[in-house]
Amino acid sequence: MGWKTLDDMDLAGKVVLVRVDVNVPMEKGEVTDATRIEKIVPTVEDILKKGGKPVLLAHFGRPKGKVVDEMSLRLVLPALQKALPGTKVSFAPDCVGEEAEKAVAAMLEGEVLLLENTRFHAGEEKNDPELAAAMAKLGDVYVNDAFSAAHRAHSSTEGIARLLPSAAGRLMEAELKALDAALGQPERPVVAVVGGAKVSTKLDLLGNLVGRVDHLVIGGGMANTFLVAQGTEVGKSLAERDMAETAREIVAKAKAAGCTIHLPLDVVVAREFKAGAANETVEAGACPADAMILDAGPKTVAALSEVFASARTLIWNGPLGAFEIEPFDAATNAAALQVAQLTKAGQLISVAGGGDTVAALNKAGAAEGFSYISTAGGAFLEWMEGKELPGVAALNV
C-alpha cells in the first residue's frame, strides 16, 4: 500500500492537523448519535501518546461557504470532550487565520484543539489552494482520518495533503486495509450482495463488480428490474421498466466475465406495504397482478446460503427486501446472520457499507459478526465502483 500510517511518522512536539468526520446527527443543539466522534478517538489518542498536538479539521452540514451558527462545530465540542475524558479539548472560532493560529500557539502537550467548520469558507469545496495553504500553515504534519469524505477533492481532504508530510489515521487505515482485502487482493471466490431500490443509482457499481467478483447477488427493488428484463411479470412491484435493456447488458457483461448473477427464485408478495400485511410466498414468476414483491423467499435464502458457504470473501451493499418493515426483513436477516456466522468461524472475510446496509445489519443483530462495516456511505460506494478517491490518492504522494 502506497500510503503512510501513524507508525511511520515522528510526531513528537509537532502540531498534527487531523481531518476527521464528526458530521453527526443533532437535535435541538445536542448530538443524538456520537458514533462518528467515538471512531476518531484511537487516532487522537495515538497522536497524544506520540507527543503530537492534535488539531482537528472537520466539516459539519452544508453551510455553503457562509457562517451558519446552527452548523458551528462548537455544538460538537461537549460530545468530543465526553469521548476524550481527562483530555482538555479547546475550540477555535475559525479554521484558518489569526484566531486559529493563536489557538494552535497556545496549545500545551496533551491537549486537543477543534477548529471551526471548514465549509464556512467557500474555498473548501472548490479545493482552493490558498485555503489549503492557510490550513497547512497551522501544522507540521497532516493526517486524514475521514475516509467518509475521501471521495471529495476539498482543501481539507486533498489540497492540504499535498503541502505537508501526510499519513492515514487509524480509522482510515482500517478502512483501506478492509477494502483492499475485499476487492484489492481478495481471497476467492468473491461474492457481492447488492440490494436497494434502483438499478439507476447503482449502474457504475454493478458494471465494476461483474468484472471483479465471482458471484453477484441482486436483491431489493433492483432484482425486480432484472426479473422484468428476463420477461418475468412482477405485478405492482417497484421496478424500473425503462432500465430493462441496461439490466440485460449487465447480465451479458457478467456472463462474459465468468460472474454468476443470482436473482430471487421465490418472492414474498403483499397487496399493501405495511407492517404485518397479509402476504404469501410464490415462485419468482408468479407474482399476482395486484400484488408487489417485498422480499426474497426461503428458497432464495437457501440457495444463497450455499453460495455464501462456498465463498471466501463477501462485500455487501443494500438490503434484499423492504427490511424496515416486518415480516419483509426475513431474507435480509437470515442472509446477514449466516454471513456473520461464517465470518466468526473464520471461513469468510465480510465487508459491508452504505447507510441502509448498516441499518439493516444492525437490525438483524449481525453487524458485530462482520469483518468490517464501513460507515462511509458515498466514499464506500465510489470505491466499490472502482473510482479513485482523491483523499486517498493524495496520501500516496
UniProtKB/Swiss-Prot annotation:
GO terms for cellular component: cytosol. Substrate binds at D21, V22, N23, R36, H59, F60, G61, R62, R119, R152. ATP binds at K202, E324, G354, G355, D356, T357. Keywords: ATP-binding, Cytoplasm, Glycolysis, Kinase, Nucleotide-binding, Transferase. GO terms for molecular function: ADP binding; ATP binding; phosphoglycerate kinase activity. It comes from the Bacteria. GO terms for biological process: gluconeogenesis; glycolytic process. It catalyses: (2R)-3-phosphoglycerate + ATP = (2R)-3-phospho-glyceroyl phosphate + ADP. Pfam families: PGK. PROSITE patterns: PGLYCERATE_KINASE. Pathway: Carbohydrate degradation; glycolysis; pyruvate from D-glyceraldehyde 3-phosphate: step 2/5. It is found in: Cytoplasm. The keyword Kinase applies. It is an enzyme of class 2 (transferase). Its EC number is 2.7.2.3. The keyword Transferase applies. Monomer. Belongs to the phosphoglycerate kinase family. PANTHER family: PHOSPHOGLYCERATE KINASE (PTHR11406), PHOSPHOGLYCERATE KINASE 1, CHLOROPLASTIC-RELATED (PTHR11406:SF23). This is Phosphoglycerate kinase. The lineage of its organism: Bacteria, Pseudomonadati, Pseudomonadota, Alphaproteobacteria, Rhodobacterales. The gene is pgk.
